[in-house]
């Protein structure tokens, strides 16, 4: 399993943003421990939220945080609409949910400057397929 650690201004507030968008909180270190770190999950995919101190995110790089990277998450097909609705209400920006040219039903969301492509699991029949 690969778990990215994303630089944030406040990992605890960042976790709140993700949880409001439908993710679950896996853990949060104590605020006074000296190592601010949280972890959130969506459909089994985890993302850790760390600090943006200069040793993790140099000041000159802050304007480009998340540039050139998009995280692809596969979620259960039965959950994609609810996940889309939660992200529509709480993400920085969200595209419409649509059938992608490569066959996935998916949407793009930006949370705290990081891009996510959230797609329905193609191994599962769509909720309205009658299977």
Label the model's feature ranges:
Residues 1-5, 24-75, 82-110, 120-131:
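Vicinal oxygen chelate
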Residues 15, 80-81:
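Ser/Thr-Pro-rich, acidic low-complexity intrinsically disordered regions of eukaryotic RNA-binding
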Residues 115-119:
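Short glycine-/small-residue motifs
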